[in-house]
């Protein structure tokens, strides 16, 4: 399957922005603590923790920092009292948006999320309003690689799909619980991924034009600026021509 790696570009853009803000490690540590608290400190027996570990390593977090966060979760650190909250809504141009949060104060979090939507021409929806448009998947990404080699190793390891893009990037899609196992198998075959993360993949896309794309980007930026927001997923499709103007 060929195409342009817009989803990969979105992930890379987000990672760069989060790193610039100095927030990405804070958010990853919060997820590590919570995952360890809820499912135990063994990544092999805790898919959510394994996904958080993979994300931490993809963002160059040291093993020492990572292990301390897991220990905090297992030991009942205060951060482990966070709960996962999912908000759904519609953004500019009819984009479907899902926001994954970790919070110890629902009222604070929903107020911040609602404010971002109202400032950017969107609407916070009810539970289930857009969730049906997304599927939770593991995404293992290679910026470059041999398509046949990666595809053979990935499918043999249990991957669901392998997508090659026009720019040479390759994404391997897995059941989210199997992402760690598939990544291990790829590494055992000498194929080191550039990133691995659990994501919500949309089944449909909403085309953004020169008017709606900047509004969508502003909404995403505002949501990602919220301390309680861990991830923002959307189905906005931005062409190369429009992206060049942003």
From Swiss-Prot:
Residues 1-20 are annotated as: Disordered. It comes from the Bacteria. One of its GO terms (cellular component) is cytosol. InterPro entries: Integrase-like_N, TACO1_YebC-like_2nd/3rd_dom, TACO1_YebC_N, Transcrip_reg_TACO1-like, Transcrip_reg_TACO1-like_dom3, YebC-like. It is found in: Cytoplasm. One of its GO terms (biological process) is regulation of DNA-templated transcription. The keyword Oxidoreductase does not apply. Pfam families: TACO1_YebC_N, Transcrip_reg. Belongs to the TACO1 family. This is Probable transcriptional regulatory protein YebC.
């Amino acid at each position: 399957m060929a195409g342009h790696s817009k989803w990969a570009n979105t992930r890379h853009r987000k990672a760069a922005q989060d790193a610039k803000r100095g927030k990405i490690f804070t958010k990853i540590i919060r997820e590590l603590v919570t995952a360890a608290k809820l499912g135990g400190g063994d990544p092999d027996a805790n898919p959510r923790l394994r996904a958080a570990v993979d994300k931490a390593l993809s963002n160059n977090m040291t093993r020492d920092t990572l292990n301390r966060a897991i220990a905090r979760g297992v030991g009942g650190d205060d951060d482990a009292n966070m709960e996962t909250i999912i908000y759904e809504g519609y953004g500019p141009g009819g984009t479907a948006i899902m926001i994954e949060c970790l919070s110890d104060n629902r009222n604070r979090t929903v107020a911040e999320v609602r404010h971002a939507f109202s400032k950017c021409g969107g609407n916070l929806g009810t539970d289930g309003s857009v969730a049906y448009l997304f599927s939770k998947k593991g995404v293992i990404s290679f910026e470059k690689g041999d398509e046949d080699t990666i595809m053979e190793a990935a499918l043999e390891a249990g991957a669901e799909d392998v997508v090659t893009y026009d720019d040479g990037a390759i994404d391997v899609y897995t059941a989210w619980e199997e992402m760690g196992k598939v990544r291990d198998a790829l590494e055992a075959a000498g194929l080191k991924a550039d990133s691995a993360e659990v994501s919500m993949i949309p089944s449909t896309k909403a085309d953004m034009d020169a008017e709606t794309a900047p509004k969508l980007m502003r909404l995403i930026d505002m949501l990602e600026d919220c301390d309680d927001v861990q991830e923002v997923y959307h189905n906005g499709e931005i062409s190369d021509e429009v992206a060049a103007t942003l």
